[in-house]
């Protein structure tokens, strides 16, 4: 039982880390004029940073298709190539990264279960995520949980990968 719980937690944190790296990449390198990804991701991401609530106005599918489609393709690849179940579960969690991010902008509108998960520190709270939208704007890229951001921010991870790239 403990092994299963640990497996779920680690898969969730792995998904949060992957989502954080992609979020950093979007913020750092994409805009609406970027070939291929500009219209799908760059433009909406820029809009989100000028109007944090804009992406809440669309449907579930409109808000999440950019994470659902690649995640489901990755899940399919995991099943086809007999990958471990932790990879499959990580991509399943990752498919919901934008939705969990949306909940981080929806204080008082998330229902009791999501609100409780935010209060307990399982899901990222609105207060935690708000730090990403304040100066200096280069912290708190992981959008699913509050667990990884303090560590990654403290060790300068985002500045390090900026240097590497």
Predicted ranges, named:
Residues 42:
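N-terminal Rossmann-like or analogous alpha/beta NTP/dinucleotide-binding catalytic cores
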Residues 61-79, 145:
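Core segments of transmembrane alpha-helices
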Residues 12-14, 118-119:
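Alpha-helical interaction segments
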Residues 49-56, 72-82:
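Membrane-helix exit/interface motif
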């Amino acid at each position: 039982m403990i092994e299963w719980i640990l497996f779920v937690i680690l898969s969730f944190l792995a998904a949060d880390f992957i989502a954080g790296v992609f979020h950093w990449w979007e913020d750092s390198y994409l805009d609406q004029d970027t070939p291929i990804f500009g219209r799908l991701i760059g433009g909406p991401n820029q809009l989100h940073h000028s109007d944090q609530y804009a992406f809440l106005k669309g449907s579930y599918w409109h808000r999440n298709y950019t994470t659902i489609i690649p995640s489901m393709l990755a899940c399919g690849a995991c099943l086809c190539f007999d990958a471990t179940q932790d990879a499959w579960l990580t991509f399943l969690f990752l498919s919901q990264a934008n939705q969990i991010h949306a909940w981080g902008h929806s204080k008082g509108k998330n229902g009791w279960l999501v609100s409780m998960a935010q209060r307990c520190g399982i899901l990222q709270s609105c207060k935690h995520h708000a730090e990403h939208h304040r100066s200096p704007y280069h912290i708190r890229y992981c959008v699913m949980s509050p667990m990884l951001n303090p560590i990654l921010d403290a060790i300068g991870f985002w500045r390090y990968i900026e240097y590497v790239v």
